Amino acid sequence: MRLTQMPSEFQKALPVLEKIKEAGFEAYFVGGSVRDALLHSPIHDVDIATSSYPEETKQIFPRTADIGIEHGTVLVLDGDEEYEVTTFRTEDVYVDYRRPSAVSFVRSLEEDLKRRDFTVNAFALDETGEIVDLFHGLEDLEKQVLRAVGVASERFNEDALRIMRGFRFQASLGFALEPETFKAMKTLTPLLEKISVERTFVEFDKLLLAPFWRRGLASMIESQAYDYLPDMASSQDKLNRLFDLETDFTFESSEQAWAALLWALEIENAQSFLKSWKTSRQFAKQVQDLLIILALRENGELSKRDCYRFDIDLLLQAENLRQAQGKEVNPQAITEKYQSLTIHDKKDIQINGGILIKEYGYQPGPDLGEILTEIEFAIVDGELENNREAIHAYLREKK
């Protein structure tokens, strides 16, 4: 099969392929970018595979960088563009179900492609637009099926993260898992405990943010993979609560998706749960803020102080999630209340601790902090104008 129209992302990278070919080596576009081109989906990363070894690749191009040369990858700088060019390779026995004990460079495209996870990710595309399909990936693409390359159990034993990737690809593509592939995934889910939490988080996060997240999550639940994820053992019934969200609902952000997950799981200690997933402090704080906003909304409308406390984006994401839960919402009222605030941060106040110390004799300490907080909330509540004259008058009354 030949692509009738080469996507612009590939056209930009064609000079790289052509230079490698001119040097006497093979070179192809490979991986998910080829699949996305066939599906007419946006292309994000253009990856190139070649029969040239890393040192040979570096001799072909004047500007390169070593970003993973031990795995055969050289970063080629072509004008303003950067391309990862990786040597065809085979992999030895995998250690800890995560990484190969050794990587061997080869000259064979077939040897390289047969180590990949799913047939729809095992395409190669040459400079003429010809598709190399050694594992019937085109047929699977047509049938919308996710099938492991070769023997499924071998692929998942090599890298157990591929189990989560399978659920994630199902969520992003909307494809069905081929029965033997899914059977192997279900059998080998205990291996997920061998995978670093950080890698698992990335795949689970992508699953939740994907357009067909319900399909991926349903397969994950059916496989009982959740039993081997941090703080999620025996959580099937609670995970199913996510399916109570509106049928066509998709998450706006990772923070919103994980807030929904914690809501479904009825997690009491969000901080502990997110720590077990090794998320960043900033991410954990925003997820917890969303949960707080949801709890506040359960008790009625948000106050001015509530709107001041949280970023408008989080306030609206919480309202969006409430709508998906089938609850009454009023994003316009929240937006208007937020916009009516005369300050949105302490830094907006027309006075500071230094002025209070210099002009009013306050000393650094709790009393200073208390009066600043009092001024802050008086402004937020609309009881005090945010200008020096009004604040000075307020302070004189306090004295």
From Swiss-Prot:
Mg(2+) binds at residues 45, 47. It catalyses: a tRNA precursor + 2 CTP + ATP = a tRNA with a 3' CCA end + 3 diphosphate; a tRNA with a 3' CCA end + 2 CTP + ATP = a tRNA with a 3' CCACCA end + 3 diphosphate. ATP binds at residues 32, 35, 116, 159, 162, 165, 168. GO terms for molecular function: ATP binding; CCA tRNA nucleotidyltransferase activity; magnesium ion binding; tRNA binding. Pfam families: PolyA_pol (PF01743), PolyA_pol_RNAbd (PF12627), tRNA_NucTran2_2 (PF13735). GO terms for biological process: RNA repair; tRNA 3'-terminal CCA addition. It comes from the Bacteria. The keyword Phosphoprotein does not apply. Keywords: ATP-binding, Magnesium, Metal-binding, Nucleotide-binding, Nucleotidyltransferase, RNA repair, RNA-binding, Transferase, tRNA processing. Catalyzes the addition and repair of the essential 3'-terminal CCA sequence in tRNAs without using a nucleic acid template. Adds these three nucleotides in the order of C, C, and A to the tRNA nucleotide-73, using CTP and ATP as substrates and producing inorganic pyrophosphate. tRNA 3'-terminal CCA addition is required both for tRNA processing and repair. Also involved in tRNA surveillance by mediating tandem CCA addition to generate a CCACCA at the 3' terminus of unstable tRNAs. While stable tRNAs receive only 3'-terminal CCA, unstable tRNAs are marked with CCACCA and rapidly degraded. PANTHER family: CCA TRNA NUCLEOTIDYLTRANSFERASE 1, MITOCHONDRIAL. HAMAP family: CCA_bact_type3 (MF_01263). This is CCA-adding enzyme.
